[in-house]
C-alpha cells in the first residue's frame, strides 16, 4: 500500500509491492475484509476539520516522553508580542525558548514514526504495537523493558490483546462456508457468514452491529484506544484497522483519529494542544517549562499550565486563584461575614433589623439571644438594651471569627474587582483595534503616510500588553505577604496602572486635524513610558523569584 495515500502507513518495507501487484493480490485474497496487519490504518479522510471540535478530550495530565519527534525547523518562542487572543505578553528573557507548532497531520506522522521505531525491535503488527504503546503511555523504554522480561503472555493480557504469534481463532472460523446463515448475537438476525466479522478473540457479529457499536463508543462515550470486543465479558481491544474498516462515516473516523492522537499528545511532556476553541494545532518544545508560546491561530498561552500567558504570577498561584473564583468559597465567606449561627441549634441567621434581641425562627429551638455577644438574652434585661458581656472569651472568639471572615472577604473583593476590571478593559481594548484602524485611515486622508500612522497600532498593542500584565499582578499581589519588596512592587504596579489609563484615554479621544501632531506626540511618549514601566515591574518580580525575595500567603 502506498504510504502517501490517505493515512495508511506501511512499516515493513521489504513487503512493499507495486500498485498493480497489490491490486491483483487483493482481488484474489479470500480474506479481503481483513486489512494487512503491517499497516496502521487511520483512514483516508482529512485530519483537520475546523467545524468539528473535540471538547474535553484534551483534558488530562502529561506523562512520559516519546521519542518520535521529527526534525522540523524550530522557531523562536513568545517574545513581547501580545494583543489578540494571547492574554498576556512574553517576558524578554524568554526569547531563547524555542518551539514549533505542528498540525494534527504532523502529530500523526510523529506517532507513526514512534510505532515504526518500536516495531523495528519487537516485530509485531503496527496496530498491536500502537495498543501496547498506549498502555505504557507511549513510553518506549518501559514497553521494551516489559516486552523482553520473559513474560509475554502476562504483558499481552494486561494490554488486552491476543499474542500475534499465536494462531488466530478468528482466521480458523473464517474457513466456514459463507453460504451458511447464522444469527448475530447482538441483533439476532440471520446473515450469511461472509457478513460477520470479529477480532482475534473469535467473537463474531454482523457488520451493522459492529458499526453501530463502534460509532456509539467513539461519538457518545469518547472512547478511542480502549474500545473492547462487544461480547459479554471479553476485554480484547479493537484495533485501528478494524475500526477504520467497519466505520463509513468520515466524521466518526475523524473523531477516532483525534482520540488516538490526543492520547499521544497528552502522554508526551514536550507536546501541548493549543487551548483555543476549534484549533487542532500542537506546540512542541525542546524542554517543558512555564514559558509563553504562540500558536499559528494567534493564541498565546503558558506551555506549563495551558492558561493564557500570565506573567508575572506563577502557574501554582493562578491555578489556586481560578479555583477560588470558580467555587463557592467566597459565598461561604460572605455568609460567615454577614450572618451568625444560633448558639443553640446552629442554624444560620441574617439580621434584618436594628434590634439586637434575636429569636431563632427554628420551630424546634426558638432560642432568644443577643446578636452582639451571642449570649442568652435574659441576663441583658428588658428595660433597655445594654449588652454587658463584651469581655467574655466565647463572645470575643465569635466576634473575632466574624471579623476575620469579613476582612478576608473585603480583601478578596478588593483584588478580584481590580482583576475583573482589567479583564473587562482588555476585552474593550481588543475592540479598540477596529476603531484605531478607522482613525488610521482618517489620518492618512490628512496627508499622513501609512508609516506615520502606525504609532496608533503600536499604542494599542502596548495597551493590551499592559492590561494583561496588570490583570495578573493582582493575582500575584493577592497571595503576596507584605514586606519591603512588596511595597516596591505595589508602587511599580500603581505607576504602570496610572500610565495605562492615561494611554487608554488618549486612544479613545476624537482626533481632529488641529490636534493631530499633538496627540501623536503624546501617544508615542505615553506608550513608550508604559513599555518602560511594564519592563521595570516584570524585571523586579523576576528578580524576586531568582533571589527568593517573595513570601506568600497560603490560602
Swiss-Prot record:
Active site: 355
Record: residues binding Zn(2+) 6: 370, 373, 380, 387
Activity regulation summary: Autoinhibited by the ariadne domain, which masks the second RING-type zinc finger that contains the active site and inhibits the E3 activity. Inhibition is relieved upon binding to neddylated cullin-RING ubiquitin ligase complexes, which activate the E3 ligase activity of ARIH1.
This protein's encoding gene: ARIH1
UniProt region (UBA-like), positions on chain: 103-151
Broad class of enzyme this protein falls into: transferase
PANTHER family: RBR FAMILY RING FINGER AND IBR DOMAIN-CONTAINING
Residues annotated to bind Zn(2+) 4: 302, 305, 310, 315
Subunit details: Interacts (via the first RING-type zinc finger) with UBE2L3. Associates with cullin-RING ubiquitin ligase (CRL) complexes containing CUL1, CUL2 and CUL3. Interacts with neddylated CUL1. Interacts with neddylated CUL2. Interacts with neddylated CUL3. Interacts with neddylated CUL4A.
N6-acetyllysine PTM positions: 140
Binding residue positions for Zn(2+) 5: 342, 345, 360, 365
Annotated compartments: Cytoplasm; Nucleus; Nucleus, Cajal body
Protein name: E3 ubiquitin-protein ligase ARIH1
Gly residues composition bias: residue spans: 65-90
GO BP, one annotated term: protein ubiquitination
Function: E3 ubiquitin-protein ligase, which catalyzes ubiquitination of target proteins together with ubiquitin-conjugating enzyme E2 UBE2L3. Acts as an atypical E3 ubiquitin-protein ligase by working together with cullin-RING ubiquitin ligase (CRL) complexes and initiating ubiquitination of CRL substrates: associates with CRL complexes and specifically mediates addition of the first ubiquitin on CRLs targets. The initial ubiquitin is then elongated by CDC34/UBE2R1 and UBE2R2. E3 ubiquitin-protein ligase activity is activated upon binding to neddylated cullin-RING ubiquitin ligase complexes.
Location of the region described as Ariadne domain in the Swiss-Prot/TrEMBL record: 406-555
Similarity comment: Belongs to the RBR family. Ariadne subfamily.
Binding-site residues for Zn(2+) 1, renumbered to this chain: 184, 187, 206, 209
Region (TRIAD supradomain), start-end ranges: 180-391
